[in-house]
Amino acid sequence: MMKWSIVKRIPVYGGSFISMKHMMLVPADLSWSCSFSGMHSLINTGEEDEEELLKKIVNHSESGSKIISKIDYTNLVEKFTRDGNLSGAYDLLQSLQEKNICLPISVFKNLLAAAGELNDMKLSCRVFREVLILPGKEPLSSDCYLNLARAFINTDDCTYLTSLLKEISESSLPYRLIVMNRIIFAFAETRQIDKVLMILKEMKEWECKPDVITYNSVLDILGRAGLVNEILGVLSTMKEDCSVSVNIITYNTVLNGMRKACRFDMCLVIYNEMVQCGIEPDLLSYTAVIDSLGRSGNVKESLRLFDEMKQRQIRPSVYVYRALIDCLKKSGDFQSALQLSDELKNTSSLDLAGPQDFKRHLRSHRR
């Protein structure tokens, strides 16, 4: 009597899959109906256990004339997933793929979501790996990345995650760096900043190195979390990395991070460093540093940069005007505050930067 065993693991990358679009043959000697209702009945009545059922349906294609559809297989995998038998669902998917039977991507996504909800790290990594290489699929949605990240929320053990990411890094996937960057963002969205830093550190040792987008994304994540020391550490590492170059987005991100953390003293330091590197400040740069200097009480320097900004024909926003006016009032210079207020009133709205200008700057930098 043949022993049932799960088929060998398929190669993760480089393999090709032949999809059977509609129907598959089932052994003729099976006396029971090969419809999903028959399978459902067997599972619910206990006449056969799930292992025996898997043995029969996976070997259906060898001979026979009865027919079973992909819908039946899909429903069976979905039932396993709903019932919490996630390992059974995954094993069945693997077995079907070995038979060149590829189910819809939604089946994999649902299994990934269930694994993430149960914090099943090992299964989440396995399913995510399979979803990445499914033939003819659209780019993965944000939910797929978030569900992977959710599996690791309650643990510091990153063994399975590191193994998955290293495998992706060493793969031949043409979009592997995009995948790595989106994984980093997903872990940030789930507030796992320690794992974000871990991934960045590991990437520097792997084949798929972090690029400027990776670094800038991590800096933005750290800035939102108010982690000043970590921001400075990543910026220092980035400047030491010969494969990337800091740019205006890098410095604007750091400036905003320092401003949000109320480290106004560091804003002028970062601004001066940016200028010394030959990077010209833009609307976002001036807005961040002028606001920071004003809030720290450095009125003289904030007014100097405000004048420099206008000389370079960069239109200030209403926000910058109001920040400076407020700063002047707090310093007791009410006359200068009144003069600046009058200047704002006499300035056409066309000569002021609006929300669309900030968005335009962000879009141009991302390109």
From Swiss-Prot:
User: What Gene3D superfamilies has UniProt attached to this entry?
Assistant: Tetratricopeptide repeat domain
> Which residue ranges contain the repeat PPR?
69-103, 104-139, 141-175, 176-210, 211-241, 247-281, 282-316, 317-347
Give me the segments passing through the membrane: none
InterPro entries given in the database record? Pentatricopeptide_rpt, TPR-like_helical_dom_sf
Q: Which domain of life is it from?
A: Eukaryota
The UniProt keyword set, sorted, is: Repeat
Record family assignment? Belongs to the PPR family. P subfamily.
Task: State the NCBIfam families in the record.
Answer: PPR
The protein in question is named Pentatricopeptide repeat-containing protein At1g11900
